[in-house]
Amino acid sequence: MDEVIADPIKKFIQLYNRDYTVPLDLKIDAGNEIYHHVPKDVEQKWFEYINEPGFFRDLEIIPDSQRVIKALQQKYEVYIVSAAMEFPNCLKDKHDWLADHFPFIDWQHIIFCGNKIVNTDIMIDDRIKNFVNYPGRPLLFTSPHNLLVTDYERVNTWEEVAGLLL
């Protein structure tokens, strides 16, 4: 969900720039996590922000995700799977965010879990750890932290997802 249909990186940058005098911008080195771009003494701030109630409630939508996912539902049984248990405060935020921005996804097609051990035909994700032992077709959704990964079929945008799957 995060970095695939919702944008937590942009929100982190906004919060960081609000709280610190040295601005952080959207230019993130390939293969690095966002928190590697802040001074060492405030590196943990990322984890504080994402553990705050409300952090996930107003994230921006990844462009074209709504339209393409709605179209995918005409051809596939679509599930939203999020490893939300890692950040327990996010459960209600993510549920409410999905209800607002993806109301066409039935609540029975939303899975909050610890590990994405789902058995599906296709998984679109930004984290390669979720593809370990995954039996289906993994599609790696581009995010700064995975730009150096070459082992998986990559999609950079939801338009590319549509081109491959519709």
Regions found by a protein language model. Name each.
Residues 1-45:
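Active-site neighborhood of HAD-like aspartate-dependent phosphohydrolases
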Residues 17, 70-73, 95, 99, ...:
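Class I S-adenosyl-L-methionine
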Residues 48-81, 87-92:
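Short, acidic loop-to-helix structural element flanking the phosphoryl-transfer center
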Residues 78-90, 148, 153-166:
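Membrane-proximal envelope and lipid/glycan-remodeling enzymes
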Residues 81-133:
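Substrate-recognition "cap/lid" segment bordering the active-site pocket of phosphatases
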Residues 123-159:
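Acidic, Mg2+-coordinating phosphoryl-transfer loop and its flanking beta/alpha structural elements
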